[in-house]
Amino acid sequence: MKIPADLYYSPSHEWVRVEGDQAWIGISDYAQHELGDIVFVEMPEPDDELEAGGQLGVIESVKAASTIYSPVGGTVVAINEELEDAPQLINEDPYANYIVVVAMNNPGDLDNLLSAAAYEELCQKEQGGE
């Protein structure tokens, strides 16, 4: 399981890569592995407002449908349109294939997220509970 050290993570298995005041958001390797083959990604529209901890979209796999939560609040400035026709790209490389880019309205939201080490610990606890 890959957990890049330069990203932030949420307890609900989303990742955040920050560049300036923008946040790229996707789901983690752990999440895509648990979901299995991804067949559909429902994404917000550009200019939609997202709340930290609020619903960002839905991801569907052959196993289940799962809500995607926004780790940070802000305005959607871009979506990964490639996922509309090829949602399986998330399975192939979850960290290269973001879901949305958000212009953050409160960079303090990042303080509520996990480091790579803390996220790895969370994943190990969840795996141990199965």
Swiss-Prot record:
Keywords, sorted A to Z: Lipoyl
Cofactor note: Binds 1 lipoyl cofactor covalently.
A Pfam family of this chain: GCV_H
Cofactor(s) the protein needs: (R)-lipoate
Function recorded in the entry: The glycine cleavage system catalyzes the degradation of glycine. The H protein shuttles the methylamine group of glycine from the P protein to the T protein.
Quaternary structure and partners: The glycine cleavage system is composed of four proteins: P, T, L and H.
UniProt name for this protein: Glycine cleavage system H protein
Source organism per UniProt: Syntrophomonas wolfei subsp. wolfei (strain DSM 2245B / Goettingen)
Encoding gene, per UniProt annotation: gcvH
